[in-house]
Structure formats: C-alpha cells, structure tokens
Amino acid sequence: ALTSANTSGKKIVVLSHSFASPTFKKLFGDFKTKYPTAELVTYDAIPYTANLDAAQEVFGHRALPVYDLSKSKLVISFQADFLGDFNAQSLETSYAAARMPGENMMEHIQVESNMSLTGANADTRIPLKPSAVNKLLIEVYNGLNGGTSDKTATDLVNKLQAQGSNAVVLADGSKAAIVLSHLINQKLNSSAFTGKANLLKEYDGARYQEFLSWMNG
C-alpha cells in the first residue's frame, strides 16, 4: 500500500503528537527517503499555537521560552494562569521562591477577565473584560515606548520601570498579546528569561490545516 501510494503521488501522512526526539526525526527522514511523498504532521491536544507563533515572530524559532521567577521583584500577568498550565511549563517552584516573605518578596499583579488560580494568589487583581485586558496591555507597551494617557497603564509602567530587569510581563490568550509581552520583556531586559527554550511542543496550526486540506482534496 505504501509503495502504491508513493508511486501514484499520494500523500503518506505520519500523524503524531509532538515528539522532540532526534532519533524519531532520523527514522522519519529515512522513511521519507524511501517514500518521498511521506509527510510528518504534528497534532497536540493542547497545541500552544499562539505561544509558538509568537515565539516564531519575536525570536525566530518555534520554541517556548523558559522563565524563572525566583529572582524577580515584580510580575504582571495579562490573562496568563502561570501557576496552572501556562506555556507548557509550571512556574510554581520559582514563584514560591520569589514570594518568600521579606523585603525582596516579589509583587504580583494579575490582569484577567475570569478568576484563575494565579489571580487568586495575586497581591493586586485587576478584573477586566477580555478586550479591555488586551487594550491595557497595548497601553503598557505604548507607555514603555513613548507614552500613554491611560492612568492604570501609567501606574503599571511606573512599576515596571522602577524594577527594570527585575520585572517580567506574562501574557496569554492570543498571539498578539504574547508578542507584546515578549517585546516588553526585551525592553526591560527581564532577567526572568533564562535564555533556554522548551522544544517539546511542535504543533503548527497552518501545517495541520494543510493536512486537513489533503484529507478533503
């Protein structure tokens, strides 16, 4: 069946969850050498599409940045439930280290539309509609890059500038929001970025849609 499909030019699709294994990639490479019409398509139950697309746009590669909050003095989260399943990484351990009572205890501000585990632990929780959360994030970005007339954004910008590299902004929900958070953290030179990347998630929404078009073609 494989030889027949290959000879007739039909796609031979290997559908797999993210499998960041060099051995697996080599085996598929050998398989594709034998059957040139073979295609590898990745599908994950939790795809992290927006996170991966944002990383591709800002950093140039589809890999999730790894954070460490242990030495941060301020975290501002926009819809990011980072004590839950955020960015394919749990930040509970480094968050707990940063929240040890004392003069260096990290301040946590949560901007979100629905109560989350992370929001329940925040020093300050700012409840807003989803569209307003995104607007505030944009205003914070603007405030760090010229100015904003939004009072809440100005207050957050002042806090971020006061902490500088000891601050970090986390966002979730859309590619645009996550891109802005990355750009803000670059502006701050945030030390919460470890320089490491999580390569365990490889889902590509455009690639999966292409696979569906093959099925329907």
Label each residue range with its predicted role.
Residues 1-217:
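Cofactor-pocket helix-loop regions in the catalytic cores of large enzyme subunits
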